[in-house]
Amino acid sequence: MSWQTYVDEHLMCEIEGHHLSSAAIVGHDGAVWAQSTAFPQFKPEEMTNIIKDFDEPGFLAPIGLFLGPTKYMVIQGEPGAVIRGKKGSGGITVKKTGQALVIGIYDEPMTPGQCNMVVERLGDYLVEQGL
């Protein structure tokens, strides 16, 4: 299965009539493996900061998680495994696997819990596969 198929069929899937606004799978080096059409352009240092927060939990809390034009307030995740962010009625979930970051961005009416479920389910699967 291609990385784009994982994004299209597993991250952008419909959950209770809703789906993520955008999603991507990005390598730890910041290279995009696959992304949805609406996924924001980001700066390399934004991905570097996300990786740094996985290595040093709490790093992003005082500065926020930036991805493209959006700044998310970092909320409780799972140190070293999941980062969650909030911006107005939407937010972001980032799950770290052995080789990649699985990223989902949502807006209402999708809920944070639905976004977490979609992103973490694929991330957990990739971890089980050694990826």
From Swiss-Prot:
Pfam families: Profilin (PF00235). Gene3D superfamilies: Dynein light chain 2a, cytoplasmic. It is found in: Cytoplasm, Cytoskeleton. CDD domains: PROF. Phosphorylated by MAP kinases. Its main location: cytoplasm. Disulfide bonds join 13-115. GO terms for biological process: nuclear migration; regulation of actin cytoskeleton organization. InterPro entries: PFN, PFN_euk, PFN_sf, Profilin_CS. The modification Phosphothreonine is found at residue 111. Keywords: Actin-binding, Allergen, Cytoplasm, Cytoskeleton, Disulfide bond, Phosphoprotein. The variability of the residues taking part of IgE-binding epitopes might be responsible of the difference in cross-reactivity among olive pollen cultivars, and between distantly related pollen species, leading to a variable range of allergy reactions among atopic patients. This is Profilin-3. The gene is PRO3.
